[in-house]
C-alpha cells in the first residue's frame, strides 16, 4: 500500500485529495493546522519524512486572501505567506533530498504567479510576474521546486487556476453566490451584493483538479503543469447561471458595489494542453455542471438539466 503525506489536509483540496487517494488504496497521512508536525519547523518535517519515507508528498497548504476578504496587516500576511507557501515547501524538499530521495513531491502553485501577464492565456512558458504577496510566495515555492528538481528530487508543480467545490470557504465569490441563492430560495434573504460583475476568472471543479495532481505524480518525470479549464467566465455569468439553475432571475436579486472589493481582480485563463497531452486529463463537468453541483450540495432546489449551451 503506497503512503502519501497530504500537507494542508484540512483545506478544500486536501480533503478532496485524501478521499481520492484512499479510494485508490493509499495510506494517507494528513498534516494540518493541528499537527502532527509544524510545517514551518524544519526539524519536525525532517523527522516525519525520515520516519515515513512516503511514496508521495502533496504540498497543498496555503495562506491566501480572496479579493473580498477583509484587508490583512501586510507585514503579518507576508510573514505567514512566506512561512507556509515558501519555507515549508523548502523544508519538505530538503527532507526528501536528505532522507527519502525516492519520494515524489507535488506542489500546488497558483495562477497568481503570473501576476499581470502580457498574454490573455497563460501556459508553463509564461513569465512569472507576481504582484501580490500570495503570488510572490507561490512563485518562490515554484522556483524552489525547480531548483531541487535540477538536483534530482522528483518535484512537480501544478499551477492551479480557480477551482470550486462545496468545501470552498465563505470568503470566495463562488461560495457567496451559492449561499445567497439558497437563502433567497428559502425566503431567508432577498439581495446579494457583489463587488464586480465584469470580473473574469477561469473556474474549474476542484475534484477534477485533485485528480490532476495524482496524475501528475504518476508521470515518469517531474515538471510544471497548468491545471485550468481554459474558459474565461465573468462573475455575472456565474451569478446568472446559479440563479437560473434555481429558477430565479439574478437581475432581481444581485446588486453591484465595488466597495466590497479589497483589491482589483486580474483575469487569468490557463492553457492545460501540456497536462492533457501528458496524462489524458479532462474536466469531468462543464461550467454549468459545476455550478449546479455546488448548488445541489448546498441544498438548493434545481430546475432544468444544466448543460452549457
Model regions and ranges:
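Adenosine-cofactor binding site in Rossmann-like domains, unifying the SAM/SAH pocket
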Residues: 28-44
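Catalytic helix-loop patch of NAD(P)-dependent Rossmann-fold dehydrogenases
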Residues: 73-91, 103-104, 112-159, 164-165
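NAD(P)H-binding glycine-rich loop region in Rossmannoid oxidoreductase-like domains
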Residues: 43-84
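C-terminal substrate-binding subdomain of Rossmann-fold SDR/epimerase-dehydratase oxidoreductases
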Residues: 8, 18, 181-309
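Conserved mid-core alpha-helix of short-chain dehydrogenase/reductase
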Residues: 44, 87-95, 208
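SDR active-site strand-loop-helix element
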Residues: 7, 31, 57-61, 105-111, ...
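N-terminal Rossmann NAD(P)H-binding glycine-rich loop of SDR-like oxidoreductase domains
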Residues: 4-23
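Glycine-rich "substrate-gating" loop/helix at the edge of Rossmann-like oxidoreductase active sites
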Residues: 131, 160-172, 196-207, 231
